[in-house]
Amino acid sequence: MKRNRLSFMNKVLQSSPAVKQPKLGCHSSLSQTHMRAALLDWGNLPHHVVLRIFQYLPLIDRARASSVCRRWNEVFHIPDLWRKFEFELNQSAASYFNSTHPDLIQQIIKKHAAHLQYVSFKVDSSTESAEAACGILSQLVNCSIQTLGLISTAKPSFLNMSKSHFVSALTVLFVNSISLSSIKIEDTPVDDPSLSILVANNSGTLRRLKMSSCPHVSSNGILCVADHCQGLRELALNYYMLSDKLLLALSNETHVNLEHLRIDVMSENAGQIEFHSIKRQSWDALIKHSPGVNVVMYFFLYEEEMETFFKEETPVTHLYFGRSVSKEILGRLGLNCPRLTELVVCANGIQVIDTELICIAEHCKNLTALGLSECEVSCSAFIEFVRLCGRKLTHLSIMEEVLIPDDVYSLGEIHTEVSKYLGRIWFPDVMPLW
């Protein structure tokens, strides 16, 4: 490692315009000695060389290095090193990440707030950490942040804090940063009025908005964002926010092409078994306007809650079922999801899904990835599925317990046949025994 670092330093020094290489025969041995001494004196390195080194160092190492000399301390405060920062906040000594020191937080707010552009807050499950994050947010008044991310590493701690406190802190940022382009505020108490402030100040710059599991945002609130933020390219939301009006707004001729739409489908109320449907015409309008959009859907529903879905053609490209899904729903996928490229089924029960799987292979011509767990598929049907998909099936993750031996193929034979059709060595996944 030390040799590699020295080699890297030599390359940097040799390429530096501030360090001229000695010509053989042109200097006395004394001059050469002074030159070597200068090269070995890291305190005399040009600013841009030290800056490049600092960019590879973790913050704590950078801070230690800044105490070497005045020159390095000056580089430590160069704005380029403070464009991106992640505040880490926790209340537990057992946490896997260290909390950002309070003195450093205050130094950043006082000296580098104006330089911050890409800011994230990583908090643990405690409400105190979420409140501390909001306390920092409310002080970022002299900055122009472009990217904001609020990350809860465990349960959504932002949802447990005072809604008014959170909204107040977020509003300060929305008002003072007028060039926000990417925002991740999932699992937070953000509401419609604060989104209106976001739109009023950042409608021309917003490109990405991730706000799944925000219970205080209505379908009208997200519609306001779509109507005014014509440059929005990526959007993540819950299904209850999705509406025909929203899809039509995203399909407006003045709106840029949408690139990524993520939809989390889960019960918003205990006992809810009915969900609103989206008209096929609305989906068609979106695909006509944005033909390359990835429509990603995550389902966290029970079988009886899924009756509404996939009765008509749906342009989903990536589909994940986090709970058990019925044979009937899987059968609809092959008939009504022609754009499907990735399918993950966590469970299906004890019903064999041979027919459904082959139907998907026959009609979903773009399918490149499949994951199955806690399902049952006969070895013959699985091999036929792989044969129909062929080498375009680049990701195939199947638990060994899913495959049921039949009269034609045994578990010992299946990997050879599957490998032949995939054009690469393949084995089913095996559950570890520990």
Curated annotation (Swiss-Prot):
Subunit field text: Part of the SCF (SKP1-CUL1-F-box) E3 ubiquitin-protein ligase complex SCF(FBXL21) composed of CUL1, SKP1, RBX1 and FBXL21. Interacts with CRY1 and CRY2.
Species per Swiss-Prot/TrEMBL record: Bos taurus (Bovine)
Major location category of this protein: cytoplasm
One GO CC annotation: nucleus
Role according to the record: Substrate-recognition component of the SCF(FBXL21) E3 ubiquitin ligase complex involved in circadian rhythm function. Plays a key role in the maintenance of both the speed and the robustness of the circadian clock oscillation. The SCF(FBXL21) complex mainly acts in the cytosol and mediates ubiquitination of CRY proteins (CRY1 and CRY2), leading to CRY proteins stabilization. The SCF(FBXL21) complex counteracts the activity of the SCF(FBXL3) complex and protects CRY proteins from degradation.
Pathway terms, separated by semicolons: Protein modification; protein ubiquitination
Keywords linked to the UniProt accession: Biological rhythms, Cytoplasm, Leucine-rich repeat, Nucleus, Repeat, Ubl conjugation pathway
Protein name: F-box/LRR-repeat protein 21
Keyword Transmembrane: no
